Amino acid sequence: MTAALILCALLLASCASTPTSHTTVLGDWMADNYNRQLSSFMVISLADEPGIRVKFESIMVNRLKQEGLHAIASSDIMPVDQEINRGTVKAAMADKDIDGVLVSRLLGVERNAIYVPPSPDNSLETTFNLAAPLVTSPGYMEHRSVVTLQIDLYDSASEHLVWSLRAQTVNPPNVTEVMDKISNDVVKDLRSKGLI
């Protein structure tokens, strides 16, 4: 009986879906006629959870530094529990010689389940063996999570939005991997636009 239960559990596990994770840049925008190259950034994450805020800012700062740029996390110069608004940000970066402010925000998290129907066996063996079942792989449920983030860049002198990127991650494996991927996408896009 125990062996049958184990075999049944293994068969069910083999049918379960393990969806893959991927991040896609949904779009970007840049202000017309903005031609300033920036070299010093303050990174702000508007995450509700302090741990996620600190982690994202740290990953983005490190990625910018890999490009030879100066970057500082807001959580390094502002208390984590301090409200983030125009006044507190200006005060925190007053003596820091910051060119641009990168602000990330979570736009949404969507969770859904998708039924993947059974697939037919189209092998030659099945074609000639009419007694064989037509369906060899059962249907299953695939659970998906979709996380959408937006990263905005403000010119610190004019305080105007000069660039924005929206990215979406399907089935994020963990926060760190998502942030690593998005920080690479941000740097790649900033470089392609001549902003760094």
Model regions and ranges:
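N-terminal segment of the mature soluble domain
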Residues: 38-113
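Short low-complexity stretches enriched in small and charged residues
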Residues: 26-31, 55-69, 119-121, 193-196
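Short, low-complexity, polar/charged sequence segments that are solvent-exposed and flexible
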Residues: 60-65, 91-93, 120-125, 170-173, ...
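Bacterial N-terminal signal peptides that target proteins for export
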Residues: 1-5
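Surface-exposed short loop/turn segments
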Residues: 84-153
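C-terminal/domain-edge helix-coil "capping" segments
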Residues: 15-39, 48, 136-196
